[in-house]
Amino acid sequence: MLPDVQLLKPEVPIGLSRVGATGIKKLVEVQREGKRPIILISTFDVFVDLPAHLKGVNLSRNFEVIDEVLETLTAKPIENIEDLVVEIADHLLKRHEYATKAEARMNSELIMRKRTPKTGQRTQEVVKIFGEATLGRDGSKVIMVGVEVTGITACPCAQELVKASSAERLAKMGFDEETIQKILDAIPVATHNQRGRATLKVQVTDSFKVPIAKLIDVAKSSMSYETYEILKREDELAVVEAAHRNTRFVEDGVRYMAMELLKTFPNAPDDILVFLRQENEESIHQHNVVAERFATFGELRNEIGSPDASGSSAD
């Protein structure tokens, strides 16, 4: 009989928080009402914890679980990605009887169609979508779904510097203060831009669900404007001007995303967890900048108040 080395006692007997496999690629079909299913090429990461008395986990069981669950659940298109990761995590717990918790993550790229802002040119964009489930043998369960989108951000600090410098030059040319202000209001003032990446993850429960499409809209609201793969000249003008009239720090991105999240899901329970992240690739620096917030809906409501439809706080 072949030895099962994983069951041996380790030389250093300490428990491990997470052992598993990453980068497992599978094809997943997601159901759409009245339309053809969406085809996702998805990457799965799966983990269990390991007690101190065992040398290793049986990794082949992880691959077996994913294959079995996908074959069962994807025989026809699934309704949502959270059901899939929950099922995988649940099967992991059943297969690894020594584990006290199991985790399953799914990352996919969703291709979406949209039109450019002025000419209505057809184009596509890539949105990343996530599903994550952590299940405990004690019955605990945390399920998150999320998205990552790209956009353009325009720096308010540099814009104010350019605006102040322009005002001085106009004053030297003989323009009065009122006229200078009218000129600066009429012309989008230059600044440096970034390509931003907004990430939004929200907890889901049996009684609270969040559509991926709405999360995408909320995440996009964090930035100065959307980006497009194809732009005609009129479209390019519209994008650049709109972005420069809606400047955002990376910190602003997370805060506006939080406010839009509360507006989009006004009835979300206070204890629902959310994760918000904005990362901007700087154009005039050699580094990126990042802002994050991990909170509950209740904590955000206490800090922001109840935002009305115009986007202002109703405190």
UniProtKB/Swiss-Prot annotation:
Keyword Hydrolase: yes
EC number(s) reported in the record: 3.5.4.39
GO molecular function: GTP cyclohydrolase I activity; GTP cyclohydrolase IV activity; iron ion binding
Annotated cofactor note: Binds 1 Fe(2+) ion per subunit.
Enzymatic reactions: GTP + H2O = 7,8-dihydroneopterin 2',3'-cyclic phosphate + formate + diphosphate + H(+)
Cofactor: Fe(2+)
Record site: May be catalytically important: C155
A Pfam family recorded for this sequence: GCHY-1
Pathway: Cofactor biosynthesis; 5,6,7,8-tetrahydromethanopterin biosynthesis
Glycoprotein recorded as keyword: no
Keyword field: Hydrolase, Iron, Metal-binding
GO terms under biological process: tetrahydromethanopterin biosynthetic process
Origin: domain of life: Archaea
Function: Converts GTP to 7,8-dihydro-D-neopterin 2',3'-cyclic phosphate, the first intermediate in the biosynthesis of coenzyme methanopterin.
Protein family according to the UniProt entry: Belongs to the GTP cyclohydrolase IV family.
Subunit structure: Homodimer.
Protein name per the record: GTP cyclohydrolase MptA
Originating organism: Archaeoglobus fulgidus (strain ATCC 49558 / DSM 4304 / JCM 9628 / NBRC 100126 / VC-16)
Taxonomy of the source species: Archaea, Methanobacteriati, Methanobacteriota, Archaeoglobi, Archaeoglobales
